């Protein structure tokens, strides 16, 4: 049987749709494991968010997730700077991540043909199970 101790949830602070975080926390509760919530600030994008600290990430999560779920969850907040996928891969290796849960926003065909989404790049670059949750 698969055993999960550490799950990574990369969060996009630009997105209004992060409902998948609830699924990640419920999954972690089911398997009794820790959830690492990582925000990667893209250096080329500049400082659009005051998210250089874990507190800013925690505040965004508290806006979306019920307090009752947060109280029972084992959460580690983390912030990094650099290429999103590279930083996620580094974090998974440094923190013994067993699985990644990531939200996916549906894009139109034109957008999808021109750009790779972070979740697709991530699946191509990690050797871990990746659970992709549709955002709604």
Task: Give residue spans per PLM region.
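Short, flexible hinge/linker loops that cap or flank conserved catalytic cores
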Residues: 1-2, 124
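Structural beta-alpha unit
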Residues: 2, 69-100, 106
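Small/aliphatic-rich secondary-structure junction motif
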Residues: 2-51
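General small-molecule cofactor/ligand-binding pocket signal
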Residues: 38, 76-80, 131
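Short, solvent-exposed loop/turn segments at secondary-structure boundaries
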Residues: 48-52, 112-115
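Short, hinge-like loop/turn segments at secondary-structure boundaries
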Residues: 52-56, 118-120
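Gly/Ser-rich helix-loop-strand patches that form or flank binding pockets
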Residues: 93-136
């Amino acid at each position: 049987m698969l055993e999960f101790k550490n799950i990574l949830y990369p969060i996009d602070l630009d997105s209004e749709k992060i409902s998948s975080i609830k699924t990640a926390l419920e999954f972690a509760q089911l398997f009794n494991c820790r959830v690492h919530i990582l925000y990667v600030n893209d250096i080329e994008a500049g400082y659009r968010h005051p998210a250089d600290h874990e507190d800013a990430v925690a505040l965004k999560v508290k806006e979306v997730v019920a307090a009752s779920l947060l109280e029972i969850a084992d959460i580690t907040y983390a912030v990094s700077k650099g290429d999103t996928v590279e930083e996620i891969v580094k974090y998974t290796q440094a923190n013994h991540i067993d699985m990644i849960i990531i939200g996916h926003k549906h894009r139109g065909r034109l957008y999808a043909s021109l750009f790779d989404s972070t979740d697709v790049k991530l699946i191509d670059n990690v050797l871990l199970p990746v659970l992709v949750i549709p955002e709604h």
